[in-house]
Amino acid sequence: MSNIVIVGSGPAGVSAALYAVRAGVQTTVLTKGSGALERAEKIENYYGFAQPVSGPELERRSIENARRLGVQFVQTEAVGLTWTDRLTVETLAGAYPADA
């Protein structure tokens, strides 16, 4: 099975993770937290939400849904990328090899 490593757990990162895991790809999201979404008081007109939702609540629900489908989240900071025979995301917690 191929695997993908996504850097960042904002809406784009979690959306990418959802599509990847639904396609049968082992998916890991690297997150350091403290993104703009965590500081947003109110998000309006977001797809799937009839009423405004706080940034932290939207983030919590999105990550919960992704975890339910099998996405792995790792709390760390990406600090570099290397490419030899395979892509590797270097983080403060170690290296994460990936196919994409």
Per-range role (PLM):
Residues 2-69:
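Beta1-alpha1 glycine-rich phosphate/pyrophosphate-binding loop at the start
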